[in-house]
Amino acid sequence: MELNLEPLNLPGVESKRPLVIAGPCSAETEEQVMETALQLAKNGVKVVRAGIWKPRTKPGGFEGHGAKALPWLKRVKEETGMLTTTEVATAKHVEAALEAGIDILWIGARTSANPFAVQDIADALKGVDIPVLVKNPINPDLELWVGALERVNGAGVKRIAAIHRGFSSYDKKIYRNLPMWQIPIELSRRIPNLPMICDPSHIGGRRDLIAPLCQQAMAVGMDGLMIESHCNPDNACSDANQQVSPDILDYILNMLVIRDEIQTTE
């Protein structure tokens, strides 16, 4: 199935590499969300992310505040002019996010691995013109990733991008999720006009890996970066080890070397 795609065309965001999406793993408090967003905006970030509903691996962890936190992102948009994005995993999430004026939605790795869940989300998006970002499934299955993209596009959503966040593996010697760069590269070969965004936070799982992973993503031609950033990362309620402060993020972005010629990973 050939995808019918249009450019993301994000208002107020220049169409240059890399598109940067940054913000906390979880929306913990209104103050934390606002403080992080204000610092990111000061450094030129135009799109803020925050997890509202958190699909945790095991019960008992911080699972987010749910719809209660959506007004916090609305306030961010009103006070900073930033675009907002959050993860949706059900049709109810989609409806709540749209009602709150969220600008961009993303489908997480656990959800994209489930065709039934993706189809429910796609059905909820019919008739809605909103950018949707689709993370790779947790397992290294290119066809499953393509299938999720096709389901969303089949609902009439044309502004779509893919997010590469690595793949689950029992071997976690270096990375939290193995990058397996050949898979997103093959996806880009198959669908050349599909924007590709790298999530180095979930690939690396550690702050010290974010900078080199960002550079690798640029070297293989990815269009954007989704990076977890927190105003006080050491005290984050979730994924503290992979979040960086807005100032450290700014340093990482300023150190990137962006070339027109794309390198391979061979």
Go through the PLM ranges and name each one.
Residues F62-T86, I121-P131, W181-M196, Q242-T264:
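Alpha-helix-loop-beta-strand connector modules within alpha/beta enzyme cores
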Residues L19-P24, K46-A50, T84-T86, L105-I107, ...:
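Hydrophobic faces of well-ordered beta-strands that scaffold small-molecule active sites
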Residues R49-K68, H230-A240:
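Glycine-rich, proline-tolerant flexible connector loops at the mouths of alpha/beta enzymes
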Residues S26, I52-R56, T90-K92, A109-A113, ...:
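Active-site-proximal loop/turn and secondary-structure-junction residues that shape catalytic pockets
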